[in-house]
Amino acid sequence: MDKKEKRPTVLFFDSGVGGFSVYREAKKLLPNWHYLYCFDNAGFPYSERKEESIIHRTLAACQLINQRYPLDAIVIACNTASTVVLPPLRAAFDIPIIGTVPAIKPASEITKTKHIGLLATKGTVKRHYIDELIDKFAQDCIVERLGTTKLVEIAEQKIRGHSVDLISLKDELSSWAGMADLDTLVLGCTHFPLIKDEIQLCLPQVKYFMDPSAAIAKRIKYLLDDKNLQAQNEKYNQMFCTAHFPEESQFKKALHLWGFESLEVIKID
């Protein structure tokens, strides 16, 4: 079939299920497209991995899936991975590669108190490109940084059907609880929009939550909108992971709620 006659196939990749926050915005905007989602749970969390390992695992997974489902675009729905894998992916694939960047610029434009919090993984908050974003767009703001793996784990548990541990969440955010003029929070990890309501309970002074998911969905549409969007009946949205996990059977039962037909385990060497 000619490439222009099929609906675009888009792969979302993350170390966990945080990328759901980006996928759900894309599916809301472009409901008839063909979506694949891969979470590298065998390598989770990426914030604890070396850059070389993140690059290797991301490339391997994307290339393996591309062999089976020729891709029209890849969305790295992970802030930590986006800081290191975009150049090698763009060298390996002749298709759009879309990353996620913390929404520091829009945060600096919307804050009234000029006091912003950047909530991200430990790996992301240390990256030099975060310094560059702040220097470029938020020089007139105080930008607090909090790197956390715990909140990523809490979001993972929520999406797998467990209740959110608010005590642990409050404890992790306690250093910001007394900052009365902290009015804007940058959700610098794709997991965090999944627990935004719970975060807001812990930080009631925050008025603006900056989530780039909707902007990423619009970017996908812009890059691929010249394609025919007529759905093909033989195509189903598919999910992949890289290791079996305890809640797998329960997780599979909920797949249809997110618009996926099946979950398959793929192996990355």
Curated annotation (Swiss-Prot):
It comes from the Bacteria. GO terms for biological process: cell wall organization; peptidoglycan biosynthetic process; regulation of cell shape. The active site is at C78, C189. Gene3D superfamilies: 3.40.50.1860. Keywords: Cell shape, Cell wall biogenesis/degradation, Isomerase, Peptidoglycan synthesis. Its EC number is 5.1.1.3. It catalyses: L-glutamate = D-glutamate. Substrate binds at D14, S15, Y46, S47, N79, T80, T190, H191. Pathway: Cell wall biogenesis; peptidoglycan biosynthesis. InterPro entries: Asp/Glu/hydantoin_racemase (IPR015942), Asp/Glu_race (IPR001920), Asp/Glu_racemase_AS_1 (IPR018187), Asp/Glu_racemase_AS_2 (IPR033134), Glu_race (IPR004391). Belongs to the aspartate/glutamate racemases family. PANTHER family: GLUTAMATE RACEMASE (PTHR21198:SF2). This is Glutamate racemase. It comes from Haemophilus influenzae (strain PittGG).
